[in-house]
Amino acid sequence: MDIEFEATFIDIDLDIFRKKLKSVGAELINPERLMKRVVFDPPQDMAGAWLRVRDEGDKITMSIKQVTGNKIDEQKETELIIDNFEEGVKFLESIGGKKKSYQENKRESWLYREAKIEIDTWPGLESFVEVEAKSEKMVKSISEDLGLDFSKGLFGSVEIVYKIKLGIPPKVINDETPEITFENPPLQYK
């Protein structure tokens, strides 16, 4: 798997951030759209790993992701483009993937200096920003260009944002929440 150099930034004023994107010449490549995914545990034990089929609105992907820590170089991913969401789900089931959850989010995608800038909205959460580039150095530089403080970046999956914002333990969001949708969003954890 390749390292996925990505940082997540929360507590962002999106009006100001979109103006900044436009002022630096970023290109809106996809307006906000609904994305859906089915997430699986791999058939063999891989710490911090999951399989996913995701309908991104303009393409369908199947991937394996693994997060082994909370540093930018501890996120790995291999992703394929496929042509059928349901067949992708069947494929992962047929190789022994254990279905964990169905999840939705909304995403707006920008391109800046060969980096992907995503504005994500997940059920129950305020929108946040992800910056993904080819290296840690590039993520830092682009974050700086966009007025984002790299030292406040989060590294990992959305489970971290659910923990910070709603107090939901990662194990609960990852292993005990079979559906994350806008009709049935996670609530503050008690």
For every predicted segment, state its role:
Residues 65-67, 122, 134:
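Surface loops and adjacent helix of pleckstrin homology
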Residues 136, 140-149:
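A hydrophobic, small-residue-rich beta->alpha segment in the mid-to-C-terminal subdomain
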Residues 10, 134-136:
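Short amphipathic alpha-helical "recognition" segments used for binding
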Residues 1-116, 149-190:
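N-terminal strand-loop-strand beta-hairpin
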Residues 120-126:
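A contiguous pocket-lining binding segment that forms or flanks enzyme active sites
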Residues 68-71, 125, 137:
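Short, surface-exposed beta-strand-loop junctions and turns on beta-sheet-rich folds
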